[in-house]
Amino acid sequence: FDRSDLVWPDDVALDGVAGKAEWDLAPGLYGFAVGGAFPLEEFANSSNDKWLYGAQVGVDWASSGGDWTVRGAIGLYNFDRLEGRRETAAPPVNQNVGVTPYLQSQYPAAVRQKGNTLINLNAPICLTVPTTPGCAGSATWGLASKFRPVDLNLAVIARQFRPYQVDLGVAVVKNTGFDLADI
C-alpha cells in the first residue's frame, strides 16, 4: 500500500492476506491495485474480532530518462469493529468473570493517541450505582466513532540531482466513518 503516516506509521507490520496487480498502460505509465484483510485483535467469539480491510488503486508515471516520477493513489481502509460499544448489562460476577464477554471494545490507555475521541463503555448501572457488584472503580473507555479513512496520496520524485533525490509528497485523509451522532 502507498500510504501516509496519517493512516499508520512505517514501523507497523500487519499480518494478514494482501494481493497486488499491476498493468502497463503506456510507455512509462502503469496502474496498480492493492487489497488486503488483516486481523487486528481476535477473541474467542469471532463476531467481536477486529479487522482492517484495505483497497487502493493508483498510477505511476516515469519520464523517459527516469529523472522524474509522479505517483498518485487513493485508498479506502475499513477498521472493522474498532469503535467502542456501550455495555447494556451489568458486568459479570463470580464464576462468569473472564468467561462472559464484557468490555471487548475497550481502547487500552497504552495505545491511545491524541485526537481520538472516547466514550464511556460502562453499563448504565455502573454509572448510576457504582457499588453494583462487578463494576470497576473507574470508567472504561472506547473509541467514539467508526474509522473508515480515505487516503489520497500524490508524490513527485526528482532524480536529476544524482546521487541525491528530492521527494515531494502530499497526503489528504478523511475519516468517512465519522458520525457526530456516535459521540
Task: Describe the residue ranges of each PLM region.
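Outer membrane beta-barrel
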Residues: 1-83
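Detector for outer-membrane/organellar transmembrane beta-barrel domains
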Residues: 67-183
